[in-house]
From Swiss-Prot:
Residue intervals passing through the bilayer: 94-114, 133-153, 164-180, 183-203, 219-239, 252-272, 274-293
Enzyme class: hydrolase
The protein's name in its UniProt record: GPI-specific phospholipase A2-like PGAP3
UniProt keyword Transmembrane, yes or no: yes
Principal location: Golgi
GO molecular function: hydrolase activity, acting on ester bonds
Entry's Gene Ontology cellular component terms: endoplasmic reticulum membrane; Golgi membrane
One Gene Ontology biological process: GPI anchor metabolic process
Organism, scientific name: Xenopus tropicalis
Keywords linked to the UniProt accession: Glycoprotein, Golgi apparatus, GPI-anchor biosynthesis, Hydrolase, Membrane, Signal, Transmembrane, Transmembrane helix
Residue positions the entry lists as glycosylated: N35
Topology, Lumenal side: 19-93, 154-163, 204-218, 273
């Protein structure tokens, strides 16, 4: 299932009100001095659960987490709104999961995508013209949701970039999928050339964001452009073919639903019970759309097989 919209990519992780607070900064400095040096650091590591060490939680990370909640408690006590820290709302950590609800939602999306990949393989013969393209798209989608799960489990510079880049790869691959379906079957050389262009575009996109400081504004603008192209291309093709292929309503519904559900991102409220925020709700709401989109891919692939079979001359 392709994320036709890219609003979820537009997270500006800059300094926020919470981490600019002198109370927060002084707390982190004091905590690090008292707990993260010498024998006290050794004691911290000895007492730290194995699952926290394995997932890379450091003494400084723990100080920031504890000081975040200390600052939040002061804000609430004085009647102020909950602040964000480093571009994010404060989340209650569960085991080593930094954002438990979003991590679970991403995992469920990945499982749904994987199940639909397996169902597509079992339902569509490999002789279908779109078989390999659909499988490749499915694997790219599963990979993207894998990294989304990792990112929401443990937010680091690496996992953040992998989340963004893999999400971009799904959108670009969806554009290629649409290109193959609209005219690539008739003109494979054009589709191959366009595919090579998309690979080069993706490589340039990743290089620009990797070699220098991560440009969140550019990333948002670029992916929004990719998403709009993807959206309009699919809708235009579905509209043109609506009387020939009745199952196209599934693709249209997925596109429109993703547009509508993405509005959840605009709510941007503090997490309910410090776990469930608008981003997690959006991820949870997209899980059923995988089944509908892969149903469309299956129906369309079987349709192609049927018309190709009907075009084969019959021998008496």
């Amino acid at each position: 299932m392709a994320p036709f919209l890219v609003l979820f990519l537009a997270g500006v992780v800059a300094a926020s009100r919470g981490d600019r607070e002198p109370v927060y900064r002084d707390c982190v400095t004091l905590c690090e001095r008292n707990n993260c040096t010498g024998s006290r650091l050794t004691d911290f590591r000895a007492e730290q659960p194995l699952y926290m060490r394995v997932t890379g939680w450091t003494c400084l990370d723990d100080c920031r987490y504890q000081c975040m909640w200390y600052t939040v408690s002061l804000y609430l006590k004085e009647g102020h709104e909950v602040p964000q820290f480093h571009g994010k709302w404060p989340f209650s950590r569960f085991l080593f999961f930094q954002e438990p609800a979003s991590a679970l939602a991403s995992f469920l999306n990945g499982v749904a995508s994987l199940l639909m990949l397996l169902r597509y393989r079992s339902s569509v013969p490999s002789s279908c013209q779109m078989y390999r393209t659909c499988l490749a798209f499915s694997m790219v989608s599963v990979n993207a949701w894998f990294w989304s799960t990792i990112f929401h489990t443990r937010d680091t510079a690496l996992t953040e970039k992998m989340d963004y880049f893999c999400a971009s790869s799904v959108i670009l691959h969806s554009i290629y999928l649409c290109c193959m379906r609209t005219f690539g079957l008739q003109y494979p050389s054009i589709a191959n050339g366009f595919g090579a262009f998309l690979v080069l575009l993706f490589a340039c996109h990743v290089s620009y964001l990797t070699l220098g400081r991560f440009d969140y504004s550019y990333n948002m603008a670029a992916n929004t452009g990719f998403g709009v192209l993807n959206l309009m291309w699919w809708l235009a093709w579905c509209f043109r073919r609506r009387f020939h292929q009745p199952y196209l309503w599934k693709c249209v519904l997925v596109v429109i639903s993703l547009q509508s559900l993405a509005l959840l991102e605009l709510l941007d409220f503090p997490p309910v019970m410090w776990i469930l925020d608008a981003h997690a709700l959006w991820h949870f709401s997209t899980v059923p759309l995988h089944f509908l989109f892969y149903s469309f891919l299956k129906d369309d692939s079987l349709y192609l097989l049927k018309i190709n079979h009907d075009d084969i001359p019959k021998l008496d």
